[in-house]
Amino acid sequence: MTQQERTYKNLLAHSARYPELQPRDLFKYLYQSAFGCEHLVTSKEEAVAYIQCEYESMELLGNTAVEPLDGAYCRVPLAILREGLSPKTLGELFCRSAKKEPQGREALQEKLQVAREMVLSGRFSFSSSDFDDALASWRANGFEAVRHSEEFRRAYHPAYRVISKAFVPFLPLFARLDRLLLQKGSAVLALEGGSASGKTTLSKLLEELYGCTVFHADDFFLRPEQRTAERFAEIGGNLDRERLLSEVLIPLQKGKAVTYQRFNCSAQALEEPITVTPKALTVIEGAYSMHPDLSSYYDLSAFLKIDSDYQRERILKRNTPDLAKRFFEEWIPMERIYFEGTEIESRCDLVISIADDDFSFEKRA
């Protein structure tokens, strides 16, 4: 599908969703599609305060469905806050989504051309002359950001923030975390999933959003003396889970500082002990982190499920041919045996499926 075809499809869906939209509402949609929210961000503190104030003043909460724009951004309704997402987290995502789009003007012009062709073919409720007059005025003002029309506001009561689509797959996870932290004051999260599914990237984002402590399962590889045939015959035996349990999870459960040793793959030995004082949120990320021997120590768990073709593409892009071969012939088969043998996916609280740009969620009670 070409970008023009995608724009046509998205505009068709947008007009069907909002039959009362006026030319300026169409312009706003296209502007946000091309430029995102770069023009709106002043400071993180102000962004959070505005979200809180607007949410509290809303008379109609509406639905919580995220609305895709025609590009790398989407509209997240403020009503989503009632599902547990905090104004602070949404404000953080909003600010992190604000960036300069150097190709924004060019993209906007291309989208406007598609929109005009659709107007001429009668795809919108307003006339082509109304569209052309509004477009001429908008162009004269330098294609500045516009507000929704009064007609649109009366009909639909819009209240949302524009954020990057890259954050959308993780909104249910953020909402669960925000609820947990509000209720308990602290939480331990397991990020489980296959190779190249984005666990480390997500843990870095969580660290930036929540200032959390992150422990990596890769630091608990088996030591050479543990790599026996009997050990590898165990389902999920490819992790020193005993050490992860004794050095990290049990101290966390007791509210104590964690002193542990990272396994150095190059030296094939444990490094010197380090002591970490956990924050309110602690994340354990990596395959095997939700092993049945460990799962009871978590407050929340998420499984990142990656499409096999996309997984292969990512691994080939990130690694040397020799290392990629080890992934395909050694580590991924072991992960699959573990996933199937322990039914980890079904035992996690949240499943986030990732297949290229296609994301979906399976919420669990």
PLM region spans:
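Long, basic/Gly/Ser/Thr-rich N-terminal segments
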Residues: M1-R153
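Conserved lysine of the Walker
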Residues: K199
